Amino acid sequence: NETIGGVEFPYIPDVGDVPLVADFSSAYLSRPLDVSRFGVVYGGAQKNLGPAGLAVVLVRDDLLDRARPDVPAIWDWRTMAANDSMLNTPPTFSIYLLGLIMEWMEEQGGLEAIGAANEAKARSLYEAIDSSDFYANPVEPRSRSWMNIPFTLADPALDADFLAGAADAGLVNLKGHRSVGGMRASIYNAM
């Protein structure tokens, strides 16, 4: 998932024997995903898992011994794995919050239910955008993100008024990324 442009792969690429590496910051626990097809999956917790300051990294066992000798111990996955991810003092409060979020997700019905809710949120928003002449989404439907939905108005001069009206209705932080403008709705699990 790429958050600025609101695109994501609609499939897991087949890369043969080459280890596939992915940043799952926005996709972690958004729906069931087959992580066994990846060599490395990493991501910050701040989108779907918890507060900023915590990273979740999954490394396939056969890749642990491939670190270069000049890699500092803190970034050497082999060393981290040998120390049960406790080479340094872990961010305990962030891990505690991650645990609470995992409990909440189970209470919602688990990953299948979270995925169904996220798909419904995204579908509803895309349908509203696509059925209107007032809004536009630049991403081809097959490559659209479930988590980050960029859109523009037919008249960009209305952007400021739209954002103010949205804020009055309780919809905040919709301003698009500075590099692309427009609007962007981030609809992570907690939304």
Kindly label every feature range from the protein language model:
Residues A45-E127, E140:
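Active-site C-terminal subdomain of aminotransferase-like
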Residues I149-D155, L171-M191:
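Conserved PLP-binding active-site segment of the aspartate aminotransferase-like
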Residues Y135-A166:
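Conserved PLP-binding catalytic core of the aspartate aminotransferase-like
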Residues V21, V35-Q46:
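Conserved active-site segment immediately N-terminal to the catalytic lysine
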Residues Y11-V15, P32-S36, K47-P51, P141-R142, ...:
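Solvent-exposed alpha-helices and their adjacent loops that cap or buttress functional pockets
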Residues G5-Y11, S30-S36, A52-A55, A67-D70:
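A short secondary-structure junction signal
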Residues N1-Y28:
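Active-site phosphate-binding strand-loop segment of PLP-dependent enzymes
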Residues V40-Y42, L54-L58, N148-P150:
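Conserved hydrophobic/aromatic beta-strand scaffold that supports enzyme active sites
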